């Protein structure tokens, strides 16, 4: 089984250790929910892009990878979650700076991105491409 907060929770439940599972859930600060919510945003953008585009509404999203923020630092420094963070492959071998993410957002809000519609822009140092090389 992989070493990540969700796997730790499932392992504890399979072993009948509900108390430890609850501890992991509390420690993970909603890691599972956070990941699922990012997927939900991406799916909503893709499903609404055509309809909203016809109404003149531009709809795109950014999918940032690990970025040096207080939330990232809290996870990276956590004694349990930090191990999972370290295990995430980043081909660029570092986390993003907030300015790097902001630059992509600035482009997406500019006239240069006027023709973009229904796009999810991954700014993750290549993590998505490495983990899902055939997904578009």
Over which residues does each language-model region extend?
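Glycine-centered small-residue hotspots that permit tight backbone geometry or close packing
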Residues: 1, 53, 103, 125-126
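Short, small/polar-rich loop/turn modules that mediate ligand/substrate recognition or access, typified
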Residues: 53, 58, 116-118
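A glycine/serine/threonine-rich, flexible loop-to-helix segment
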Residues: 2-20, 67-90, 130-136
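C-terminal helical subdomain
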Residues: 34, 39-42, 61, 69, ...
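Extended hydrophobic secondary-structure segments
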Residues: 119-135
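Catalytic loop of short-chain dehydrogenase/reductase
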Residues: 1-54, 66
């Amino acid at each position: 089984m992989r070493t990540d907060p969700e796997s730790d929770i499932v392992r504890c439940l399979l072993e009948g250790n509900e108390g430890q599972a609850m501890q992991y859930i509390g420690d993970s600060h909603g890691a599972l929910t956070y990941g699922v919510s990012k997927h939900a945003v991406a799916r909503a953008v893709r499903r609404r892009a055509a309809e909203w585009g016809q109404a003149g509404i531009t709809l795109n999203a950014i999918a940032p990878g690990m970025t040096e923020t207080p939330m990232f630092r809290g996870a990276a420094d956590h004694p349990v979650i930090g191990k999972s963070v370290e295990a995430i492959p980043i081909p660029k071998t570092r986390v993003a700076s907030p300015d790097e993410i902001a630059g992509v957002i600035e482009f997406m809000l500019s006239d240069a991105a006027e023709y973009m519609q229904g796009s999810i822009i991954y700014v993750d140092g290549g993590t998505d491409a490495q983990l899902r090389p055939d997904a578009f």
